[in-house]
Structure formats: structure tokens, C-alpha cells
A protein has these predicted regions:
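Active-site-proximal cap/lid insertion segments
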Residues: 1-140
Length: 140
């Protein structure tokens, strides 16, 4: 049911955002672009390593990116199971990491929400990569 979604991915109180309200992926892109602009006239070769945390948990994307994906149109995998098939043998119960990130047992809706959040986070990160590529083009 839709009542089993216990949090909002754009809730800044859950981490993923700096206290100033900006998403970590945006800050990382900003810092990368600033570094390129500050070094555009250097005669030395440029090497940068930009390591986004996205799309790892927690899946937190700005609301406008989550809204791009209609949760009711998102498919659930054919192999969907409400509980881990080996949970009893592993004696893990609800202690598996994934079991703490969603209602237990799983519902179709919770899987749709997780996918919606994941798609939104990837789309948001892709927009930041696009900003970096544009800065590369501008700065040579």
C-alpha cells in the first residue's frame, strides 16, 4: 500500500544535503567546475577524479527529479519476493541492510518507490555530470 513509504527522498533532515540545503552531488559538481575554471590557464596536464556518492543509499534526490517518474508506471521485477529467500538460513531476519531501508516484508509499492528514488538520483547525478562536461567544453 502507499502507506508503507516511510520517508521522502528530498527530506533534508535525513542527510545527503549540506546544511545550506544543497545536494551533495551539486556541491561536488560545483567544486569540480570551480577547480577546472581556476586551472584553465595552467600549462600542466589536468587530472581530476570526481567521485559521486550517488546513486548509493540513502536514495535522496531533489523532489523535482523524483516527480519526473510516475511511481504507478514503474514496473516490479518478475522475480519480486516480499522476503529474502535465504533469510531463515542466514538467520538475519530484519537485520539485513536492505531490510532496514524499506518496509518488511516488501510490497510491490515499496519496490516501485525504491526504483523511483533510484531513477531520480541517477537523473540528478547525470545532470551534474552534464554541467561538468559543459564546463570542460567552455574551459578547454
Amino acid at each position: 500500500s502507499k502507506e508503507d513509504n516511510t520517508w521522502l527522498p528530498w527530506d533534508k533532515s535525513k542527510g545527503g544535503y549540506w546544511s545550506e540545503g544543497k545536494h551533495w552531488s551539486e556541491i561536488l559538481a560545483d567544486e569540480t567546475i570551480t577547480y577546472m575554471e581556476e586551472n584553465k590557464d595552467s600549462k600542466e596536464p589536468l587530472f581530476m577524479f570526481c567521485a559521486f556518492n550517488a546513486p548509493h543509499d540513502p536514495r535522496q534526490a531533489p523532489k523535482e527529479y523524483v516527480d519526473m517518474y510516475d511511481v504507478d508506471k514503474i514496473s516490479v521485477p518478475q522475480n519480486f519476493l516480499p522476503v529474502h529467500p535465504l533469510g531463515e538460513q542466514m538467520k538475519s531476519g530484519k537485520n539485513l541492510r536492505d531490510e532496514q531501508l524499506a518496509p518488511f516484508p516488501r510490497t510491490h509499492y515499496s519496490v516501485q518507490k525504491h526504483r523511483q528514488e533510484y531513477y531520480a538520483l541517477i537523473t540528478h547525478m547525470d545532470a551534474q555530470v552534464g554541467r561538468i562536461i559543459e564546463a570542460l567544453k567552455r574551459n578547454g
